[in-house]
């Protein structure tokens, strides 16, 4: 299975946000898309998910032309192509468990979706997704009461509930501290490695792309100017992606670092402190 962007362009008025991008991604790759703000990274992901339509070119997944889908077929694609946003896109007043179960809506009948009636099996799936991300203890809290890192993990759990073939993550760690950034990136890599799901993530930070992605795509002014492995991302390639400063010097990579690796800290293994109270399964009525 493969995914192919064929000469995809997106214009907003006279501005070309994405310019003639032609990229093929085999199933199961973890791809980082890097570049300055305004390089076209978010627009590219939104076109893949069909939140935005291309002005020209076409998008293909296996034998399906994604860019021409409409109605139920388009909804099915957006179910199969889960998207995670920088601002989480949760419903703040709903509890975490319900937010996660909303990922099943496109798998269900219209009547059940309308009344948000979830099955026992779906509740178990949601709890399992939260447990996988280490946040099952907040299952019955309102999503709006969580920290940014916790909310992003809820968003990832919701994406898992879609049973996707591809996960798109649009700047998933841009607003997070280094600890939570590492937890989120570890979760995305785990999804990629354990399920073999294609993950495409937009990143501002070179160190994160190098550490987590087997393939890096660099964008500048809407065009792909680099496509290769982390080892191939040389200083010259970085300069082509990010340009130079006002004095004409190459970009300082410390400016594009999250300091995501904290020496001596076992961040991924650090246990989450659970609050006292009933177990999440009991709270969920399971």
Swiss-Prot record:
**EC number(s) of the enzyme?**
7.3.2.2
Q: Which SUPFAM superfamilies match?
A: P-loop containing nucleoside triphosphate hydrolases (SSF52540)
User: Which reaction is the catalytic activity of this chain?
Assistant: phosphonate(out) + ATP + H2O = phosphonate(in) + ADP + phosphate + H(+)
Q: Name one GO molecular function term.
A: ABC-type phosphonate transporter activity
The membrane topology of this protein is: Peripheral membrane protein
Instruction: Enumerate the UniProt keywords alphabetically.
Output: ATP-binding, Cell inner membrane, Cell membrane, Membrane, Nucleotide-binding, Phosphonate transport, Translocase, Transport
Q: Which SMART domains match?
A: AAA
Known partners and oligomeric status: The complex is composed of two ATP-binding proteins (PhnC), two transmembrane proteins (PhnE) and a solute-binding protein (PhnD).
PANTHER family, alphabetically?
AMINO ACID IMPORT ATP-BINDING PROTEIN, PHOSPHONATES IMPORT ATP-BINDING PROTEIN PHNC
What is the protein name stated in its UniProt record? Phosphonates import ATP-binding protein PhnC
The scientific name of the source species is Agrobacterium fabrum (strain C58 / ATCC 33970)
What is the name of the gene encoding this protein? phnC
């Amino acid at each position: 299975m493969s995914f192919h962007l064929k000469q995809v362009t997106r214009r907003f008025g006279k501005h070309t946000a994405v310019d003639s991008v032609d990229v093929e991604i085999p199933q199961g790759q973890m791809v980082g898309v890097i570049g300055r703000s305004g390089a076209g990274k978010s627009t590219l992901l939104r076109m893949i998910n069909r939140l935005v339509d291309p002005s020209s070119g076409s998008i293909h997944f296996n034998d399906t032309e994604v860019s021409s889908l409409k109605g139920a077929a388009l909804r099915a694609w957006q179910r199969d192509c889960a998207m995670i946003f920088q601002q989480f896109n949760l419903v703040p007043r709903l509890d975490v468990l319900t937010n996660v179960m909303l990922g099943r809506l496109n798998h269900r009948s219209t009547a059940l979706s309308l009344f948000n009636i979830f099955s026992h099996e779906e509740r178990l799936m949601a709890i399992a997704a939260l447990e996988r991300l280490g946040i099952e203890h907040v299952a019955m809290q309102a999503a709006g009461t969580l920290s940014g890192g916790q909310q992003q993990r809820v968003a990832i759990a919701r994406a898992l509930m879609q049973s996707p073939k591809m996960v798109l993550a649009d700047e998933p760690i841009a607003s997070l501290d280094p600890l939570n950034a590492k937890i989120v990136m570890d979760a995305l890599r785990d999804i990629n490695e354990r399920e073999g799901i294609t993950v495409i993530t937009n990143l501002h930070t070179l160190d994160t792309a190098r550490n987590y992605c087997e393939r890096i795509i660099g964008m500048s002014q809407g065009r792909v100017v680099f496509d290769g492995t982390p080892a191939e991302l040389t200083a010259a390639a970085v300069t082509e992606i990010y340009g130079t400063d006002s004095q004409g010097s190459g970009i300082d990579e410390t400016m594009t670092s999250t300091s995501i690796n904290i020496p001596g800290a076992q961040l991924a293994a650090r246990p989450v402190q659970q609050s006292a109270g009933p177990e999440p399964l009991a709270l969920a009525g399971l």
